[in-house]
């Protein structure tokens, strides 16, 4: 089994870029950024529970990474960079730390390296469980209205919140809930030590108004790029700034 994806071929010898979206996004999320890199092969993946992969069930990160590997092989992508946002960033970090074959570099935007104690994991398990129940049983417009009131999204304007709520409400609540539980921070290990031991380039992107993830970026051995005029979802709020950072990282 493989994940649904959109593939754009590039020029021979150019880097292959594999993009992983955030929770409730899909393969279109990274395209305004990725399509600025025409020379590179670009693979935009729908994670399980999302988009064209909505019906694919997973029990945890191991299943997600197994599906990711199968998808890369199906497209004959043997050497690549992973670029992931939020949930996609956490999947990318997990894959990197588990030694996914062919990975040449890692770019994470606003991805959490992991909680560091059992109390924090227990609290997150309860929180994600409550959100999952809401995704299963309540209208998605109501759930996402409240979702985007969380402190991490404080930099969004009312208009941006409204647009995101309308966009994300096109998802399937049941499959979102299942993926939220399967990949919760409550079940993700603390990756800091493993990330600090990576033998290939690791870059971290965060919005200048995203104080939480700017602080987390200092806890991993990554080169940090701060995206101006952006909060947690920097590639949506300032795509040109993220394009500039990726061009520097990839030396294009």
From Swiss-Prot:
Statement: the UniProt record of this protein carries the keyword Lyase: yes
Top-level EC class: lyase
A GO BP annotation: menaquinone biosynthetic process
GO MF entry, a single one: 2-succinyl-6-hydroxy-2,4-cyclohexadiene-1-carboxylate synthase activity
Pathway: Quinol/quinone metabolism; 1,4-dihydroxy-2-naphthoate biosynthesis; 1,4-dihydroxy-2-naphthoate from chorismate: step 3/7; Quinol/quinone metabolism; menaquinone biosynthesis
Catalytic activity: 5-enolpyruvoyl-6-hydroxy-2-succinyl-cyclohex-3-ene-1-carboxylate = (1R,6R)-6-hydroxy-2-succinyl-cyclohexa-2,4-diene-1-carboxylate + pyruvate
Keyword Lyase: yes
Lineage: superkingdom: Bacteria
InterPro entries according to UniProt: AB_hydrolase_1, AB_hydrolase_fold, SHCHC_synthase_MenH
The protein's Enzyme Commission number: 4.2.99.20
Keyword terms: Lyase, Menaquinone biosynthesis
Annotated HAMAP family: MenH
Family: Belongs to the AB hydrolase superfamily. MenH family.
Function, as annotated: Catalyzes a proton abstraction reaction that results in 2,5-elimination of pyruvate from 2-succinyl-5-enolpyruvyl-6-hydroxy-3-cyclohexene-1-carboxylate (SEPHCHC) and the formation of 2-succinyl-6-hydroxy-2,4-cyclohexadiene-1-carboxylate (SHCHC).
Record note on quaternary structure: Monomer.
NCBIfam families per record: menH_SHCHC, PRK11126.1
Protein name per Swiss-Prot or TrEMBL: 2-succinyl-6-hydroxy-2,4-cyclohexadiene-1-carboxylate synthase
Species per Swiss-Prot/TrEMBL record: Salmonella enteritidis PT4 (strain P125109)
Origin organism lineage: Bacteria, Pseudomonadati, Pseudomonadota, Gammaproteobacteria, Enterobacterales
């Amino acid at each position: 089994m493989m994940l649904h994806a959109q593939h754009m071929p590039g020029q021979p010898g150019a880097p292959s870029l594999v993009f992983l979206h955030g929770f409730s996004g899909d393969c279109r999320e990274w395209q305004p950024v990725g399509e600025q890199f025409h020379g590179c092969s670009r693979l935009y993946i729908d994670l399980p529970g999302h988009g064209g992969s909505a019906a694919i069930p997973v029990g945890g990160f191991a299943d997600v990474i197994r599906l990711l590997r199968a998808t890369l092989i199906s497209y004959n992508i043997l050497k690549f960079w992973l670029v992931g946002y939020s949930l996609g960033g956490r999947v990318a970090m997990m894959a990197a730390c588990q030694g996914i074959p062919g990975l040449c570099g890692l770019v994470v935007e606003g991805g959490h390296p992991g909680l560091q104690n059992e109390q924090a994991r227990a609290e997150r398990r309860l929180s994600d469980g409550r959100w999952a129940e809401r995704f299963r049983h309540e209208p998605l417009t109501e759930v996402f209205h409240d979702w985007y009131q969380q402190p991490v999204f404080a930099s969004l304007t009312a208009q941006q919140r409204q647009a995101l709520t309308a966009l994300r409400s096109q998802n399937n609540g049941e499959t979102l809930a299942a993926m939220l539980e399967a990949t919760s921070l409550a079940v993700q290990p603390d990756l800091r030590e493993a990330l600090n031991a990576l033998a290939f380039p690791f870059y971290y992107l965060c919005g200048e108004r995203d104080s939480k993830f700017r602080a987390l970026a200092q806890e991993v051995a990554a080169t940090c790029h701060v995206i101006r005029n952006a909060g947690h979802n920097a590639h949506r709020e300032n795509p040109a700034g993220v394009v500039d950072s990726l061009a520097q990282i990839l030396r294009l």
